Amino acid sequence: MSTKDPHRLPHEKGFHISWDQIHRDSRALAWRLDGQGPDEGAWRAVVAITRGGMAPAMIVSRELDIRTVDTISVKSYHHQAQGQAQVLKAPDAGLMGDGTGILVIDDLVDSGKTLELVREMYPNAHFATVYAKPKGRPMVDTFITEVSQDTWIFFPWDMALQYVEPYRGTD
């Protein structure tokens, strides 16, 4: 059993992802999914969970030559606090059906609440994320990298390139 260090700052257990890294990891996800669809290995469509799943979904759809791409907007975070997941925008109902042949892509599964909600809507879809944390891992079918539950992932779309003063020490 681990106890949290009250002196540790939130960024100290951070995993910083660059654009190059998310691109490489998303391509690796595509390679893992290639030929795994239910229609002679093919997938009918990609659905990105917005907003974090959009970049990985674009890369996966390109790599697998999937031209039908839609989004589902699920909000479960307010700043860095996770709350109740709610669907703000659903994908085309005619496309989705029960999810058969659909790849649902997100950047990360954390607690699994977002994927649980979407899986209830589309039980036969295939859920893939680039990164997975242990609590959410049962909700995802395919992922590339697992990180510890207490790691905060800093994605490139959340970051700015600028000088930052050190938190400790000045010399």
Curated annotation (Swiss-Prot):
InterPro entries: PRibTrfase_dom, PRTase-like, Xanthine_Guanine_PRibTrfase. CDD domains: PRTases_typeI. Mg(2+) binds at D107. Pathway: Purine metabolism; GMP biosynthesis via salvage pathway; GMP from guanine: step 1/1; Purine metabolism; XMP biosynthesis via salvage pathway; XMP from xanthine: step 1/1. Its cofactor is Mg(2+). GO terms for cellular component: plasma membrane. GO terms for biological process: GMP salvage; purine ribonucleoside salvage; XMP salvage. GMP binds at D110, S111, G112, K113, T114, W152, I153. This is Xanthine-guanine phosphoribosyltransferase. It comes from Ruegeria pomeroyi (strain ATCC 700808 / DSM 15171 / DSS-3) (Silicibacter pomeroyi).
